[in-house]
C-alpha cells in the first residue's frame, strides 16, 4: 500500500491553518474526481423527489454570506454545497442531486431530515401557539419534561430547558459551583463543551479558546487509547486526575465535566475503566459529575446515553443537538436537591422551554422509541465499524477506527508508526466522497478525523455505499 511520506509537525496547529483546513483544500491536495464515472456503486433507492428549487444560486448565497455574516463562519468543501432539501438520511442540492448524509447537521438530526412524525406535531403546535412564555401554563413543556426525565436513571428528574449545548453546559457548571461552594472545575484535554465564558474555559483545545479570562479550570490528561500517553490504561489516566485534584486544587472541587465520547475532538472513546474510576475520585473530592451528552445522547451510541456504557450515574446531565432533531433546544437534568440552588436568586431563560421546541423534543422521543432507532444505531453502527476496520487493513492511511453506535471516527495518518496527521489528505478524500454523493464531517485537534454521525435511520445499504465511496476515494490518492 502507498505510504504517505509527508511529515507534519504535530506539536501545534495554528488557528489560521486550522480554519483553512476546515473550509478548503490545499492546492497540492485538491483535485476534482475526473474519473468518478468509474465508481460503480450507486446510492440505495429512495422514494422521494424534491420539488424544483427556485431560490438563489450557491454563488449568490455565498456572496451574501461574505458581505453580511460573520467572517468566523466557514463552509465545508472546496466548492460549497447549496443544500435546499432533506428527507430522512438524504440531502439534496439546488440541482436536485441526492447525497447520503453521514453528518446529520453535526450529530443533530437523529430521527432523519424532515421526519413526518416530528414535522406534523410541530406544524400543529406552531399554528396554535408559538411562544406563550413559561410564566403561563402550557402542556408542551410539562409533557416533554416528564417524558425526558423518564429516560434518566435515579433521582435525575428535574429539567431546565435551554436553547443550545453551550447554554446547557454553562448552566451545569454554574449549578455545580453553587451547590458545592467551590470554584474549581476539572475537565479533560481535547474535550469540547461550548464557546461561552465557562464552557470555553472547560474546553481543552486551543483553537476554540479566545484570549479572555477563563478562571479555575484544570485539564486532566486525555484518556485517548490511540494518542494518549498511557494508551488504553484507564487506571493511569484516572491516577493523573487524582493527582491533578490533589496538587492543583485545594483538594475539593465543584465538578468534573466530560463527554462519554469526544465529538469535536475526533470521536475519541475514553480508555476502558477511566470514567468509573474518575467518578469515584471526583466524589471523594466533593465534586459533581457532569455528563456532557450534547453529541452522544439520544440513542446515538447504541445506548440512550453515552455514560450508560461506563456504569456511572452522573449528578448532572447536559444535552442538545439530537434532542430536537434540528430545533434549537437544549436541557440540563439533575436531582431535586441540586436543582434547588437556582432558587437562591432569580433564574430565567426566555426561550428555554419554548412550546414549539418542546413539542419537537417530545416527538423525537416518540420516534426513537417507535422506530427502535437506538437498536438500529447499535446494529448498523457495529456493521459499519466492522466494514471500516476492514478498510483499515487495505489502506495504510487509516490509523484508527473507533466509536460506538452511529458515532464513529476514522483517523487518517501519513505514517502509522509516527501517527503523523494526514490533514491535507483528509480534506482531499472528503471532497472526493462529496463528488461521489457522500457527506461526512471532520474533527480532531489536527483536523484529520472523519466524523461519521448520520441520522439514526441509516441502513446497512447506506453503510455499504459510504464504505465503497471512502475506499474508492482513498484508492485514487
From Swiss-Prot:
GO biological-process terms attached to the record: photorespiration
Amino-acid positions noted as binding pyridoxal 5'-phosphate in the UniProt annotation, renumbered to this chain: 165-166, 192, 292-295, 350
Main location, first listed in the record: mitochondrion
One GO molecular-function entry: pyridoxal phosphate binding
Localization annotation: Mitochondrion
Known catalytic reactions: glyoxylate + L-alanine = glycine + pyruvate
PROSITE patterns: AA_TRANSFER_CLASS_3 (PS00600)
UniProt keyword annotation of Metal-binding present: no
Co-factor(s): pyridoxal 5'-phosphate
Alphabetized InterPro entries for the sequence: Aminotrans_3, Aminotrans_3_PPA_site, PyrdxlP-dep_Trfase, PyrdxlP-dep_Trfase_major, PyrdxlP-dep_Trfase_small
GO annotation, cellular component aspect: mitochondrion
Transmembrane residue ranges: none
Protein family (similarity comment): Belongs to the class-III pyridoxal-phosphate-dependent aminotransferase family.
Subunit structure: Homotetramer. Interacts with GRF3.
Name listed for the protein in its UniProt record: Alanine--glyoxylate aminotransferase 2 homolog 2, mitochondrial
Organism, scientific name: Arabidopsis thaliana
Gene responsible for this protein: AGT3
Amino acid at each position: 500500500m502507498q505510504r504517505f511520506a509527508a511529515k507534519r509537525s504535530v506539536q501545534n496547529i495554528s488557528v489560521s491553518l486550522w480554519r483553512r483546513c476546515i473550509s478548503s483544500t490545499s492546492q497540492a491536495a485538491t483535485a476534482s474526481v475526473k474519473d468518478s464515472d468509474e465508481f460503480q456503486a450507486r446510492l440505495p433507492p429512495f422514494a422521494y423527489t424534491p420539488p424544483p428549487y427556485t431560490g438563489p444560486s450557491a454563488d449568490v448565497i455565498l456572496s451574501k454570506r461574505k458581505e453580511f455574516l460573520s467572517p468566523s463562519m466557514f463552509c465545508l468543501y472546496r466548492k460549497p454545497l447549496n443544500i435546499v432539501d432533506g428527507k430522512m438520511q438524504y440531502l439534496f442540492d439546488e440541482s436536485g442531486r441526492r447525497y447520503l448524509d453521514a453528518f446529520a447537521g453535526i450529530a443533530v438530526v437523529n430521527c432523519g431530515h424532515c421526519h413526518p412524525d416530528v414535522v406534523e406535531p410541530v406544524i400543529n403546535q406552531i399554528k396554535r401557539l408559538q411562544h406563550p412564555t413559561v410564566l403561563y401554563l402550557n402542556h408542551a413543556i410539562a409533557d416533554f419534561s416528564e417524558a425526558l426525565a423518564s429516560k434518566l436513571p435515579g433521582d435525575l428528574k428535574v429539567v431546565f430547558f435551554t436553547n443550545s449545548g453551550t447554554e446547557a453546559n454553562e448552566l451545569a457548571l454554574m449549578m455545580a459551583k453553587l451547590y458545592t461552594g467551590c470554584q474549581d472545575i476539572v475537565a479533560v484535554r481535547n474535550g469540547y463543551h461550548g464557546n461561552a465564558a465557562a464552557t470555553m474555559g472547560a474546553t481543552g483545545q486551543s483553537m476554540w479558546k479566545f484570549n479572555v479570562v477563563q478562571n479555575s479550570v484544570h485539564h486532566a490528561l486525555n484518556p485517548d487509547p490511540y494518542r494518549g500517553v498511557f494508551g488504553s490504561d484507564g487506571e493511569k489516566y484516572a491516577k493523573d486526575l487524582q493527582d491533578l485534584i490533589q496538587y492543583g486544587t485545594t483538594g475539593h472541587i465543584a465538578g468534573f465535566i466530560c463527554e462519554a465520547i469526544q465529538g469535536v475532538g475526533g470521536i475519541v472513546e475514553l480508555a476502558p475503566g477511566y470514567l468509573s474510576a474518575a467518578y469515584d475520585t471526583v466524589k471523594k473530592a466533593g465534586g459533581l459529575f457532569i455528563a456532557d451528552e450534547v453529541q452522544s445522547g439520544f440513542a446515538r451510541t447504541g445506548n440512550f446515553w453515552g455514560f450508560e456504557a461506563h456504569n456511572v450515574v452522573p449528578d448532572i446531565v447536559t444535552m442538545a443537538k439530537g434532542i430536537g432533531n434540528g430545533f434549537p433546544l437544549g436541557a440540563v437534568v439533575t436531582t431535586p436537591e441540586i436543582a434547588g440552588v437556582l432558587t437562591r436568586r432569580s433564574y430565567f431563560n426566555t426561550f428555554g422551554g419554548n412550546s414549539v421546541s418542546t413539542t419537537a423534543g417530545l416527538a423525537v422521543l416518540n420516534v426513537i422509541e417507535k422506530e427502535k432507532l437506538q437498536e438500529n444505531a447499535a446494529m448498523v453502527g457495529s456493521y459499519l465499524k466492522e466494514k471500516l476496520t476492514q478498510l483499515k487493513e487495505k489502506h495504510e492511511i487509516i490509523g484508527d477506527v473507533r466509536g460506538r453506535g452511529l458515532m464513529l471516527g476514522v483517523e487518517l495518518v501519513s505514517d502509522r508508526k509516527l501517527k503523523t496527521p494526514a490533514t491535507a489528505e483528509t480534506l482531499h478524500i472528503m471532497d472526493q466522497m462529496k463528488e461521489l454523493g457522500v457527506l461526512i464531517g471532520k474533527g480532531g485537534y489536527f483536523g484529520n478525523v472523519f466524523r461519521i454521525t448520520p441520522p439514526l435511520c441509516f441502513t446497512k445499504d447506506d453503510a455499504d455505499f459510504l464504505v465503497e465511496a471512502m475506499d474508492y476515494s482513498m484508492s485514487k490518492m
